[in-house]
């Protein structure tokens, strides 16, 4: 993902979910970025540009031990 795109997504997630969320580019991947809550990795956000419509999908695994 481009830096401007990451900046916009990070701003949205900070306003919507938590102000300490950070999004970091993934090496050699241009369709996704890593999402962190503080220093803890919490998931991946994917860019979906299908049929001319751009959307994003956030994927987060929740371990049973964390419940």
Language-model features and meaning:
Residues 1-67:
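Terminal leader/tail segments of proteins
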């Amino acid at each position: 993902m481009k830096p401007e795109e990451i900046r916009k997504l990070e701003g949205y997630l900070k306003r919507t979910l938590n102000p300490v969320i950070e999004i970091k580019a993934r090496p050699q991947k241009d369709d996704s970025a890593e999402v962190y809550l503080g220093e803890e990795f919490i998931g991946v956000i994917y860019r979906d540009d299908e049929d001319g419509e751009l959307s994003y999908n956030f994927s987060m695994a929740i371990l049973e031990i964390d419940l």
